[in-house]
Amino acid sequence: LSTVLTVGRFSLTVMLFTLATCFGLGALIGKALGLNWKTSSLINAGTGICGGSAIAAIAPVIEATDMDIAYGLSATFLFDTVMIVVFPLLGRAMGLSDAAFGLWAGTAVNDTSSVVATGYAFSEAAGDFATMVKLTRTLAIIPAVLVFAAIQLHLKKKAQTNAPGVKVRLSKIFPWFILGFLAMSALTNLGLIPAAAASVLK
């Protein structure tokens, strides 16, 4: 946790900017391409936060269809495949340092496994830093899921207004797994869960 917080101090501004750009620009592009908001949101979440993990976390909250999820995963992993090959070449061409490339890869590449592959393809130091940046970026899943839960609740209430028979229950929309994630993180950092058990739970 301390390492993530240390890295976060240096990368937070960059990550916030890229997340805002990703969701803002992604929404406009999705609208221009005629994508529904669920498909567009999943692609944006996968691209901006944590690839398939973000899509898996947000999809049930917004009640995405299998097709929405398929489009989101396909777009995310397609971008990842290109980035793994192109980023190290561009990094060397631009003469980036290990830290600069690690920050770039950890912020821009989608999925965690792809970040690891891209970072270590450049250098070991870049791979180490990219991985920590990515782990910090992954924490954005928590507020993102809560925001999408609020959006879904708003849409449900709007539907209820138009169709009085529709019932809206916060308990069915709220992402309860977030509380479990936070509880396990707190217990692990307090040393209340043995390292062996923590590795199994992960």
Where are these regions (language model features)?
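Alpha-helical membrane segments and immediately flanking helix-loop junctions
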Residues: L35-M83, A100-S123
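Entry/N-cap segments of selected transmembrane alpha helices
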Residues: S2-A27, A70-V82, A198-K202
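Interfacial loop-to-helix junctions that mark the boundaries of transmembrane helices
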Residues: T6-M15, G127-T136, K167-I173, A195-K202
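Helix-coil boundary and interhelical linker segments in multi-pass alpha-helical membrane proteins
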Residues: S2-F10, G91-A100, Y120-F129
